[in-house]
Every structure is written in structure tokens, then in C-alpha cells.
Amino acid sequence: MSSLSQGDSPSLTATASSSSSSSTSGSRTPKANNSFNQSAASYFSYPVTHVVSGLYRRLTEPNITKASRKDSNSPNRKMNARNNRDSSTTSPDIFVPIRTASPFQPPPLTPLTLTPGPGVPQQQLLTRALAEEIRLLVPARLQLVDTWRLAYSLDRDGASLSTLYEHCRDFSHRSPRAGYVLIVRDSSPAGAVFGAYMTDPPHPDSHYFGTGECFLWRASVLPSPSNLLNINGPQSEEMLERAGLPLPPSADTTHAGRSTTLRGDSRGHGDGRLAAPRANGGTGAGAASGASTPERIRFKAFPYSGVNDYMMFCETGFLSLGGG
């Protein structure tokens, strides 16, 4: 009985309160409508009043505004503001260090060591001087690496792109952050050498890959100055460029890359290191300039231009670099 009565009393109380509230709301309906109309009127009239009062105040007080502007632009006011700013910066709570250039310079890079690997012929395409030139263009984090290892050689591994992809994949597993330098020699009598630097290991893919750190390069052996002087007629821009001489002012140098002339190994010097090809295709023993005359190699790089992102594109049948 007691539990049942306790359950009935709240329902009766709630019903009574709802009826009383409905009667009260019915009696207060006109007042609510009046307050709503007043709030709507003030909502539309307040912005207009604010704008009109602002314009009136600006038009009726021109002297005060001009005086305030003069005071703000006065030399004394500027000097006080500067003193306050200096005092705030030199306060003991704020420490402003004095920065000067460090007299210490980073140490020079250690010489490169080219490791051809077993079963590779003594005569190779890459010289140490050419490798040092390529090293200056690779990312700074990889310039500290002083040992370059041969991953693939046409003479040792055969003409197979799948073998090239496989060997580069093995190197990427051992060194995930390694870079890759591609060296190619054409079949022309001059034996020009060209190649590229690749940020990623070459592998078959359906899309372009690589970053803006990739670049192309080429190197060629320059003829001796005596041969250049014997050429009759005006010298072309290509001959001037190969000789290491500056181009004429009329030449288009908009897309000119990095060019360097460097001295290669001596002719006929077979020390077992990676060496550059000879310009005449011979061994250099019967060269007219003598066996001790060093070669001059023309190096030119073509960095990322920013036009597109077509860096590397490889498939099972071809390898493309700088497609854009």
C-alpha cells in the first residue's frame, strides 16, 4: 500500500503543475508578443543608430582627431615609443643573445673510394675526378659517404635490365637511403660519357617516381688546344662549350646547367681505377702529346627545372630518366 501511494502522488502533482503552467502561459501570451516586437525593432534599429552616431561624432570632432594624429606622429611620441620598446627588449626578464658568424668552417670531404668489385675489368667508365664532380651535386647527406660501390656492370652482369633492377633492389635493402649514379658510354668515336643521379633504385613501375634531387649529366674529353687553333673558320658554340671557353653574349643561356672543366688521369696510366674513355678510342701510347699529358674532361649537369615531376620511369623493356 505505501509503495503504491508513493507512486500515485507524483503523477497527480505533475498533472496539476502542467495544468497550472498552461493557464499561466495563456495569460502571459500578449506580454510575450510585445517583448518579441520590441526585440525585433531594436535588432534592426541598433545598427542604423550605431552608424549614424559614428558619422556624426566623426564630423563634429575634426580638431580632436587631427590633434591626436599630430601627437602620435610627433618626434617626442616616437622617441618615447622607441625608448619603451628598447627598455622592454633590454629588460632583465628577456635575454637577447648576440649572434655572430662562427669562424669555424666544416671540414673538407674525404676523398672518394671507388670499389668496382670482383670480376670487373680494369678499364671502367668513371674516373675519380668525374666522381668528385658528381658528388658535389648529390644531396648533402650523401656527400659524406666516401665509398661508392659498383652495383651493375654491362661487362660483368650482361645486357639485362632485369639484372640491373635486381642488383639495385639488393642494394636498397642493405642501404635504404642510398643514391644511385648511372654511367653510360655511347658508341661514337669520341666516346662521350653521360648519365644521371637517381634518388630511388630503378624498378619497373606504372607511374613516374623520384624527387627533384635527380639530375642528368654528361662528360666528354676535350681536344687539345693546338687542335682547336687549327680549325679554320668561325668556331661554333658547341666547340667553344666543349673547349671550356665562355659562350658569346648572343648565346641562349636560359637553360644552361652546371659546367666544369677538370683534369683527368694521365694518358696510358693504367692504375686499375675507374678511368674515363679515351677520345680517340686508343690506349694513348702513341698519342702525339706524349704519354704524360693529362686529359681534360668537360662536365655539365642538368638539374631539376621544376617544370614537371617526370623524373624516372622504368619498365621491363626500357629505363627513362628526365622524361619531362
Curated annotation (Swiss-Prot):
Keyword Chaperone: no
Superkingdom assignment: Eukaryota
Region (Disordered) residue spans: 1-35, 63-113, 244-292
Any GO CC annotation of this UniProt entry: nucleus
Compositional bias (Low complexity): 9-29
UniProt similarity note: Belongs to the OXR1 family.
Annotated protein name in UniProt: Oxidation resistance protein 1
Provenance organism: Aspergillus fumigatus (strain ATCC MYA-4609 / CBS 101355 / FGSC A1100 / Af293)
Gene that encodes the chain: oxr1
